[in-house]
Amino acid sequence: MRFFKAISLIFSATLMSGIAQANQLTILHINDHHSHLRADGRMSLNIGGENTRVRSGGFPAIVSTFNKLSAGKSNVLKLHAGDAITGDLYYTLFKGEADAALMNEVCFDAFALGNHEFDDGDAGLVNFLDFLNKGGCQTPILAANVVPKAGLSPLTKNSATDYIQPFTVVNKGGMLIGIIGIDIANKTKNSSSPDETTLFLDETETAQKYIDELTSKGINHIILLTHYQYENDLRLAQKLRGVGIIIGGDSHTLLGDFAGLGLNSSGPYPTVVENADGQAVCVAQAWQYSQIVGE
């Protein structure tokens, strides 16, 4: 028996100001798969009142679930909130090549860098991103508060934005949506191995800077794609103006009601808080290790 649960919620007009109901947007997302590409047979769930070991997850199941949840829908946004690599022998053996190949089967609209993307330094990250860029997807790599030193970091062959962008803008059914990437700064500097010259800026100040830049250009539908932890995301949402959705990672947080399976959740999916404008912000995260797709 395989457990592979898709958390279901459509981010519709009521959650993104100015989007008409006819232009409903579906966001599919994962985070923190950490090179866990095979299904896991060690999970125990409460099924029918009995503790049952099940086979769960795996990146092929991620791919098929993305395909299933995308079928018949015209406006689908596919997001990865970081820590794609390190944590399993697949990374030890293939240094991100296997992860990149399977990520390109999903073809994400954006990928935010996490702290573990820097475990092998800027050069190791370049190696992984080169694998990712070999596919036909050309997924934008986002980290607005990460600034590699031009001319010194391997991430800057020609400029500081050769590999990493602060944001991307996508058009879904005529909706222009700005997606801004934020990495967890202090944790990345202190527990990973970025180059010493690579800067990590304040998360809140950087997010607001690029929200303001996008809204000044008439792009009013803003998503933060963060690798910043669930509780930090909740606080971040309340400090910012102009943000509508935060899709996060790093804390490996399970949201939603899974009590019937014996799993503990950290909150509702999505968790809704008010931003500094008094508008609703949906904060979501999709657990860990290729186990869940958030919708």
What do the PLM-derived regions correspond to, one by one?
Residues 2-21:
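Gram-negative bacterial Sec-dependent N-terminal signal peptides
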